Amino acid sequence: MKKLTLAIVAVLSCVFFVSRCALAQEWAKQRLEQSPRHHEWVDIKYGDRTVHAFIAYPEVKSKAPAVLVIHEIFGLTDWARELTDEVAAAGYVAIAPDLLSGFGPKGGGTSDYAGTDDAMKAVSGLNPDTVTADLNATADYVKKLPAVNGKLAVTGFCWGGGQSFRLATNRHDLSAAFVFYGTAPKDVSAITAPVYGFYGGNDARVDATIPDTVDAMKKAGKKYEPVTYEGAGHGFMRAGEDPTQANNEGNVKAREEAWARWKSLLKGL
């Protein structure tokens, strides 16, 4: 009986854990559902590819710049979409492509994957050239929208931070690139847009690359302004607004400061 009781407890614990994982971003989904802004899904087609993308529109009178949002290594999650809505709330047409489009187990995207581990493996295995092509197609699409004034910026987080830096080497119509805790490409010579970096002080893996990036950008004559937020870890923009996180003061503070800086920089587009 004791063994049976322990087994039942173990099963219930697993069910609880899985449920917690599945609902890990329920708070982001709820905020998204409560947003007063217009959202829509679009399919962007080029060649033999179809990229599923989420768009959030600002409530403004005139045309606005567009911001291309590149998701974390977890794929286009509820938080990634909620962040996209926050960018729209600041006054910009924000678009976030699901870069797992067509690669899911059922031919879909991020939502096809059973969990974050599977999505992470899939994102990690994406062909860099395909990613860049998907981002270029998305950028071309959003720039043509009637609500956009022709200006374009890119931002990315974690894995997406590195991709935003990389896109700046491939696309020369960017007004700015905002890199959140992402690493730089090896060759930065083709970059034409200013690059603004946002890093957590407790993120040694990424932070160790900053000095070399500063040197490379300086030698290439490019504008690069990194800021490190002490007490914050990797992924602080998500963790800093997650109400389920404990002992989260460093991430909360970093997110507030980074978001204030980001909005100020966006106004300069």
Predicted segments, located by residue:
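Acidic catalytic loop of the alpha/beta-hydrolase fold
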Residues: 202-207, 234
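Serine-hydrolase catalytic machinery in alpha/beta-hydrolase-like enzymes
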Residues: 28, 32-35, 41-144, 238-244
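Short alpha-helix in the alpha/beta-hydrolase fold that links the catalytic acid
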Residues: 83, 207-217, 229
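Primarily recognizes the serine-hydrolase "nucleophile elbow" in alpha/beta-hydrolase
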Residues: 135-192
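Short beta-to-alpha linker loops that shape the active-site pocket of alpha/beta-hydrolase fold enzymes
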Residues: 99-103, 183, 232
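Short beta-strand/loop motif that positions the catalytic acidic residue
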Residues: 197-199
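C-terminal catalytic histidine-bearing segment of alpha/beta-hydrolase fold enzymes
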Residues: 218, 223-269
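Bacterial N-terminal signal peptides
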Residues: 7-17
